[in-house]
Structures are given as structure tokens and as C-alpha cells.
Swiss-Prot record:
Protein's UniProt name: Aspartyl/glutamyl-tRNA(Asn/Gln) amidotransferase subunit B
Subunit structure, as described in the record: Heterotrimer of A, B and C subunits.
Native species: Synechococcus sp. (strain CC9605)
Family listed: Belongs to the GatB/GatE family. GatB subfamily.
Alphabetical list of Pfam families matching this protein: GatB_N, GatB_Yqey
Amino acid sequence: MPAPAAKDQAWEAVIGLETHVQLGTDSKIFTAASTTFGDEPNTHIDPVVCGLPGTLPVLNQKVLEYAVKAAMALNLNIAEHSKFDRKQYFYPDLPKNYQISQYDEPIAEEGCIEVEVAEKGKDTYLKTIGIERLHMEEDAGKLVHAGSDRLAGSTHSLVDYNRAGVALAEIVSKPDLRTGREAAEYASEIRRIMRYLGVSDGNMQEGSLRCDVNISVRRGPDAPFGTKVEIKNMNSFSAIQKACEYEIKRQIKAYETGEPIVQETRLWDEGKQLTKSMRSKEGASDYRYFPDPDLGPIEVSADQRESWRAELPELPAAKRHRYADELGLSQYDARVLTDERPMADYFEAVVGAGADAKLAANWITGDIAAHVNSNRLSYAELPFRPEKLAEMVQLIDGGKISGKIAKEILPELLEKGGSPKAIVDERGLGIISDPAAIEAIVDELLGAHPDEVEAFRGGKTKLQGFFVGQLMKKTGGKADPKLANQILSKKLKV
């Protein structure tokens, strides 16, 4: 319990996350059985998955590569030598009654990532979150509780072992998180990094990324940690945030009313928006870890590490900084553009084709992203190719067409592709920038509205906006706005 001497201090939450990332290999971690999601239950099992007598596991080398690359992206130190251990526990989803994991010699330790936190009603801030370790392990099967609301009152349970033996990278953060929002942003950044690397799709709905939250509260930053509670069953970043916020309030209330906090595992109930007790929390000694006798030591040479490091892409945080510092984008635009690698790649291709970065960002984060999302497209499938968007941006930037005209032709370009310049030329949609042509239209407008002209010259100068509107209406929005205003000002003051 938090120290009594700290009662004058505000409560502070202490949060750490265990993030389980399914590595996107075609076969499982120790066997050639398929990892395809959504197939008939219990069709991707074999003697190794079930631990039948006489079978031996063999480490999938692609799993090792993906785990090391993930660790490098999280700035972890890669161990030259590590090993696998058996974690003993009895549960229906564990066919061997033990899980092959890594205990005291994981593949990587001691790293950190930078997280951008956007708290509602507050300024966005950067926070460095320490990462204790990343280790490899095999996933368990999946229990399906039938007959009622998940565990509560279910009449029977079914077990699907298709997931058993799928490769996991478990990423354990340090207890550096202080709010539910920070926890959600951290988990989101982990997924973003894994997707950039291509080592996992991070699909939370399919269980490709799952988070367990460890949370306690204390009186101020110098007080000892309180009793830690683990929370499971959160399948979205929003659920992570809400579960943390609920549990923080629950624990503070318990301490203030003298109710003991039990070290336990609790489930997040999305329907009721609360956490519920599931079981007492085991300690490491309960699992009776010992080195797996069927698997030899894991060795990653310096040459192999450097070879894999050379294959890493530019990561989200580095992109965000570059977009802001070198391209002059706002923090918001940099964040949106780097959220998914395909969008960032599309943006960079547009800028690489000569488009102004800020204008390109506006179009991509606005109309184009809306079209991609509403039609469930990938950027690779989008008919409007990056070089053609660059062409449209250059037409706008060069004063050849207005933003209004660009919006009019955009739906066709998004659906069919093609050249913006060709469409503009074919349909005569270019900006009217001939002073004589605009002057003739202005003379016509002034002659048609003598009362407004007299009122303007009598001091109602805001009427210039009326004339600009009439001019744009008459030209279909094609008159050069700057030139039109200059000519109108000159004519109205005569």
C-alpha cells in the first residue's frame, strides 16, 4: 500500500504493458504447420504442436529474424546468446501443458521508444517509454466460451488449437506510463512500428496484437509502488485507455476507503465498461521455468545482426521528425501521414515527383484518405497515382487551376486515374489570368450593379466581396483571385 507519509501527494498511476505480437510467418515457431487465420478449427495442428512423444521442435529462422528486427526497431540490445525455457501451467488452451518461452535469457533487453501523446484538451507531448525486454514464445490455443457473455455464466467452452504454436514476440515495457492515454498511445506506436517493419499485421480484432496491462497507484512519484493488478481482454486502443482509467479510479477509491487491493488478474468488460476479477495472479516461481532440453542455445552473430539492421526501414518517429523539420509540416499532418506506412510511401512519392509538401499533405490527409478509407482501398490499388497527384498540386501551386476546380475533377481522377492537366486542357478549366479578359467582365459587372458601385464609393467597402463573388460566379470560379481583386479595386475607386 502507498506510504502513509505521502498522503498529501496527488495519486499517481504506474502502468506497464506486456504486448504480444504475432509474427507474420507462414508457418509456426517450431513446426511447419500453417498460421492462416480463420480456417476451420483444429486444422492447423500436428504432432509437434500437440507435444506428442517422439517429436522435436525446430526453431523457424524467419521467426528469429523478425524478432531481432523488432527488437532493433525498439532500440533493444540484442543478445549474442539466448535460450528457450519451458513455462509450466495447466490450462485447456495449452496442449503440451507447458509453453515454450524465454525466461532469464531473452533475445533482447533494455530499449526505449518515443511516443507522441495527444491528451484531450492538452498540448501534444513526447515521452520516452523504456522497454525491459523482448522475448520469443509460442502462442496458446483459443478458448471459445459459449452459452452466455464470454466467461460469465457460459455453459461450455470449446478449444481451437489452430493458434497454438504461432510465433509471438512479447514486448515488456518498463512501468513508465502514467495515464490511460499514454498506455493507448504506446500500444499504438508498437503496432505502428511492427507494421512498418512488415513483421506483423497488428490486427487486434484477429488477435495479432494483444496487450495485458499491469497497473497500480501510489501517492506521488517518490512513494513505493502499490499492489499491481493485471488487466486482460482489451481488443482496441480505446479499450486499453478506458480499462486503465477505470482501474485507476477503482484502486484509488479502494485505498481511500481502506479496502485492500489484491494482486490478481482482472478482465475488462467492454459492455459494462468495468474490470472484473478473474483469478489470482501467479508469480514466476509458480511457472517452474527450466531450460527446454529439446532446443539448443540461440546465437546471433555480429555479421547477422548488421545484415538485418541494414534492412530496417525508416521508422515512424524518424519520419515524423523529418516531415516536421525538413518539409515544414505541422505536427498533426506529420502524425497522420506516418500512421500507416502505405500512406507515408504515397506521400513521399508525390513529393518526390515535385509537389509542394504542405499542399500534398492537405490533399492526402483530406479527400484522398477519405476516399481510400470509405472504399476500403489500399494506396497501391488507388488509380490516382502519386505522380498524377503531384501534377495536380503543381497546377494549383502554379496558379493554373483553382482549388475549387481541383475538387471538381478529383472524384473522376480517384475513380479512373488519368492526367489532371489533360482534363483541364480538354474542358477549358484553367484559370483565367488574362488581365484584359478579366477587365472586360469587371466592366460588365459594374455596369449591371450601379447601386452597389455607388454604395461602395460611399464608404461601404465590404461590397468588394460581393463583386468578387459575382465575378467568380460568372467565370465558374476560374478567374485568378489575386488579379480579379486588383482590377476590381482599381475600377471601383475610379
